[in-house]
Amino acid sequence: MNGQSDYKGQRTAGMRGMSMDNILGDPFALATISIAMLAWFIAFIGSILATASHPPGDGFPNYSWFTIAYMLCCILGIFVVIASDTTQTYHVAIVGFLATGLVLTSSSVNSLIYSSNGAKEATAAGHILLSMVAIVWMFYFGSTPSAVPRAYLDSFALHKDHRVSSGRGMSTAYGNGYGHGYGNGRPDTSISSNVPPQMYTSAQLGGFETSSPVAGFPGGAAGAERNSSQPRFGASNLGPNGAMGSESTPGEVVQPTEYPYRAKAIYSYDANPDDANEISFAKHEILEVSDVSGRWWQAKKENGDTGIAPSNYLILL
């Protein structure tokens, strides 16, 4: 329920946050939309001149007018989607509409390109440009953000998160086998069956453990499952009265006191109320991280709160 409500909130916020900065700050979007509008005007003016120079029903295909109207709607729709930063919400629909538009523009080119009339040739040239832009858009919107060509184009955009291609990389940011993929929706924090969960000892999480049993958190052996979607940690080192035991072994790892890494939240996250180890954070919030080797990172917020956070909600800076 939290994931669904957060997704709806992000989508609504994206529509309310429509801004020209998303267009002007993205060279690819600015260039392709500008070329598409120029091509549309060429086709539109050429169609007017071609229709005026021929008697009604003679020479100029009527469906070319529908093509012009249809492509205008596609261009305006893409403009709105990019300006509202909801590309990953509507990218499938965009590809479908562009595929239909490519068929229409190609048919118009085939009907007009062989004419000796200059107005028809100009109209055909406009439709050719529209077809080329449609092909580029279909490749862009039909690719995942982790695709190398799209990631390269997105790297020039000012408003988009730039993800590194090595180390943790984009596969972690977009699920790494256990997320829902990509987009404005939050990824899932559940664990897939083909990757073992990350285990921690009580010494590693000494500062995160509670002084009393938490409801829904059975004290079984390490790896025991619980009803939550979060991974099960190692057995606690609690004493009989609920306090942390004083015994320590040479092999134990002390609680980290340094946080050498910085990470940015690419999604907001609400901590599980049944697990006091987790911390909540907002989208774009900066966290300090002590260890980036597992799925759950030990993090500290700017206000000093410490806890664990899912790695697929964060991106290293």
Swiss-Prot record:
<keyword id="KW-0812">Transmembrane</keyword>
<dbReference type="Pfam" id="PF00018">
    <property type="entry name" value="SH3_1"/>
</dbReference>
<keyword id="KW-0728">SH3 domain</keyword>
<feature type="topological domain" description="Extracellular">
    <location>
        <begin position="49"/>
        <end position="62"/>
    </location>
</feature>
<comment type="function">
    <text>Plasma membrane osmosensor that activates the high osmolarity glycerol (HOG) MAPK signaling pathway in response to high osmolarity.</text>
</comment>
<dbReference type="GO" id="GO:0030833">
    <property type="term" value="P:regulation of actin filament polymerization"/>
</dbReference>
<feature type="glycosylation site" description="N-linked (GlcNAc...) asparagine">
    <location>
        <position position="62"/>
    </location>
</feature>
<feature type="topological domain" description="Cytoplasmic">
    <location>
        <begin position="84"/>
        <end position="92"/>
    </location>
</feature>
<feature type="transmembrane region" description="Helical">
    <location>
        <begin position="63"/>
        <end position="83"/>
    </location>
</feature>
<keyword id="KW-1133">Transmembrane helix</keyword>
<feature type="topological domain" description="Extracellular">
    <location>
        <begin position="114"/>
        <end position="121"/>
    </location>
</feature>
<keyword id="KW-1003">Cell membrane</keyword>
<feature type="transmembrane region" description="Helical">
    <location>
        <begin position="122"/>
        <end position="142"/>
    </location>
</feature>
<protein>
    <recommendedName>
        <fullName>High osmolarity signaling protein sho1</fullName>
    </recommendedName>
</protein>
<feature type="topological domain" description="Cytoplasmic">
    <location>
        <begin position="1"/>
        <end position="27"/>
    </location>
</feature>
<feature type="domain" description="SH3">
    <location>
        <begin position="258"/>
        <end position="317"/>
    </location>
</feature>
<keyword id="KW-0325">Glycoprotein</keyword>
<dbReference type="InterPro" id="IPR035522">
    <property type="entry name" value="Sho1_SH3"/>
</dbReference>
<feature type="transmembrane region" description="Helical">
    <location>
        <begin position="93"/>
        <end position="113"/>
    </location>
</feature>
<dbReference type="GO" id="GO:0005886">
    <property type="term" value="C:plasma membrane"/>
</dbReference>
<keyword id="KW-0346">Stress response</keyword>
<feature type="topological domain" description="Cytoplasmic">
    <location>
        <begin position="143"/>
        <end position="317"/>
    </location>
</feature>
<feature type="region of interest" description="Disordered">
    <location>
        <begin position="216"/>
        <end position="255"/>
    </location>
</feature>
<dbReference type="InterPro" id="IPR001452">
    <property type="entry name" value="SH3_domain"/>
</dbReference>
<dbReference type="InterPro" id="IPR036028">
    <property type="entry name" value="SH3-like_dom_sf"/>
</dbReference>
<feature type="transmembrane region" description="Helical">
    <location>
        <begin position="28"/>
        <end position="48"/>
    </location>
</feature>
<comment type="subunit">
    <text>Forms homooligomers.</text>
</comment>
<keyword id="KW-0472">Membrane</keyword>
<comment type="similarity">
    <text>Belongs to the SHO1 family.</text>
</comment>
